[in-house]
Amino acid sequence: MTYRSKVAVVYLLGFFLDLINMFIASVAFPAMAHTFNTTPSVLAWVSNGYIAGLTLVIPFSSVLTRRIGPKRVILLSLFLFSAASAAAGLSATLESLIAWRVLQGVGGGLLIPVGQALTWQQFKPHERARLSSAVMLVALLAPACSPAIGGLLVQTLSWRWIFFATLPVAIVTFVLACLWLKHEMPAMKAARLLNLSLLADPLLRFSMLVYLCVPGVFIGVNVTGMFYLQHVANMSPAATGMLMLPWSVASFIAITATGRYFNRIGPRPLIVIGCLLQATGILLLINVSSATLLPAAAFTLMGAGGSLCSSTAQSSAFLSTRREEMPDASALWNLNRQLSFFAGALLLAQALNLAQAWLPPLAAWHGMFIFAAGMTLLPVLYVFRLNNTQVLTQLRQETS
């Protein structure tokens, strides 16, 4: 196995661990509530604590990398993650569980941007589309299997095992990082927490906008839409849960297509098609009912469009980024990724509240979906400012 493949394996394993821990806890909330005799709103901090720790430490990742080198940061992050996972499973109080989840998030928040930067440095720009496809497939697999794995562990063992179960993977990743990663001499020069000057790069700036407007908006539509589908369209909880199946299939096809066609046609057509597909899927929700196939069609279009955009954005973001700038660029990218998860749900919830203050209930929901579709189309207004021909020329020069 080549060195760059080893680096990619370590990063993808770490990325999988991060996503599993972000999504697996919620399925154990009822069992945790019974153990700690608390409410769902308080238990939400078991998930929020992880996300908070992850988000808060991301800006420090590039500075720490320059101080001690990427290998040591990755090993430190995996050690923190593993220790916090074991401690979370042994927690005797809810307060200690939340505290250990925050530390888990700190480990993940160091691992992901540093691992991504190190991995991207090993691949030339024209090779990164397929690498991005592998990353996006992990991003698709982890949320899809987390609830099933978590539910099985809670049902057969205990909620504590959702934390213990990740330990073997974390330990294997730690050992592989020890054996495979080379120690790089740290650059001791001072660095800013966030190098905002990198946003002058139009590809990075545009890719971050895409993440806010497309995956971010889908998160918001998915969160608010569950209430709409169950209480307005009269779909059962089981039926709404099954909608993620066509979404996942369409996402897989879109991610595969990006890896195949990005180097041939560039980001512009893929972004335009993706935005139009997701916007159409969102608008289809206006006319859904439990007796039609429109909900499945809507989620299929959102899965195809959203994943086409997110994988294209991932492939485009660092095309013009120099090797020495990758730690800073990766920190910005991952901070924006976390922001998109928060901002999408918050923005659409506020839009719905505002619409409900002025419109009848059904019209308010429709207005929120129209607003979400409009937000999804925002990148289309900017994509034509990108020099698609220049991107293709750069990619072809790399391959020649």
Give the positions of each predicted feature.
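Helix-loop-helix hairpin linking two adjacent transmembrane segments in secondary transporters
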Residues: 135-177, 190
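12-transmembrane solute porter fold
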Residues: 5-20, 25-27, 36, 40-50, ...
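MFS-fold secondary transporters
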Residues: 84-89, 104, 177, 284-286, ...
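Cytoplasmic helix-loop-helix junction between adjacent transmembrane helices
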Residues: 102-138
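C-terminal membrane-cytosol helix-exit motif in multi-pass small-molecule transporters
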Residues: 167-189, 379-387
